[in-house]
Each structure stands twice: as structure tokens, then as C-alpha cells.
Amino acid sequence: MDIEELKRRLIAEVIDREGGYVNHPADRGGPTCWGITLQVARDNGYQGDMRALPRPLAAKIYANRYWHSLKLDDIAAMNRDLAMVLFDFGVNSGPGRAAEYLQIQLNVLNNRGRHYADIKVDGAVGEHTLTALRKHANIRGESGLFLLAHTVNAERIVFCRRLAERSESQEAFTYGWFRRVVELLSHVLHQRPVPREWIDEVAA
């Protein structure tokens, strides 16, 4: 499938997995619908009842906030596994954090600056981050990008564990978080049958 179809399918799968309205008492993000938190919905101009958040609007938010902000069209052109990891990481923990972990991994993989210069860990994927990623790909090849995808994904386990250690209430979600991360690159999550119309309604 092409990159546009990959983006649409991943967004539709997240919406399907997250489901409709949820207001878990331990969720610090408050009520969600289709996985979109109240604050994110408000930030994107939605002022209605979260129970009525339109699914096409949720899809648009996922595309803009979690795909395009991380430059995942560019990254998917290099390695789709890495794009999938960063998208799911962004959805689960915020796009800024996903970008930071990518930048940290690139900095420790540059052989003390011999392969490319360190980049600023600022949580924003821009030209410096993409240039470092391209240089990493040129030097290490496809296997290097595959390794990078796995190392970023592995860091998520540590991040989620620390959340639960700091706040016992978050243990309500720990098993699900761990399972989500572990299953991601086995593509278990990406074999979910979702309605074709959900995929098609994701805006380009």
C-alpha cells in the first residue's frame, strides 16, 4: 500500500481500537471519544459534548496532530515500521515525546558525531532531525532503520513503567500499555478489520 493508504489505515485502526466515549476515573486526560481527549478536542475547535465528537473530526485531528506534525510522510518513505511506531507513540504519549525519543536515539547512534552531528532534543521533527535520520539510513541501511524503530518502541515500555511507578492509579492501564507496545511491530494491531468507509473518511 502507498503512504497515503498507510496513514488512513493506521488512523482508522486507532479510532477502532480506542472506541467511542470513555470517562475512566483514573485517566488524567479526562473524558475521551475515539481516543481524543477533551483538551485536544477543545484545542482543535470542538466545543460540543464529547459523547458526540464526530468520527471524521477525530480522524482529521489524528492526521494533523499525530501524523503530519511528526513528518511521517517523509519518515514512512524511509521506513514504515518507524513511522508506525512514532505515530502510535504520539497517540499514546504525545507527539512531542515521540519526537524527543527519536532525537535521543539518533544522537546516541551517531558514533560520537562521526556519522552526523548531534541534533537538539526539542520534541519537534524538522529538517535537522530528518537530515540526521537520512544520514543514519545511508550509513546503516534498512537494518539500521529497523533497529531504530525497535529501540524507540522499547523506550516506550520504560516510559510507561515509570508512569505507573510514580502514580499507582496508572496501574489500571499498565498491562494494556505494555501489550500495545509489544504487539505493535508484530503487526497484530495492524491486522484489525476496520470498515472501509472509516479509512476513506480520513482526510488527505
Regions found by a protein language model. Give the residues of each.
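Cell-wall polysaccharide-cleaving catalytic domain and substrate-binding groove, primarily
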Residues: 1-204
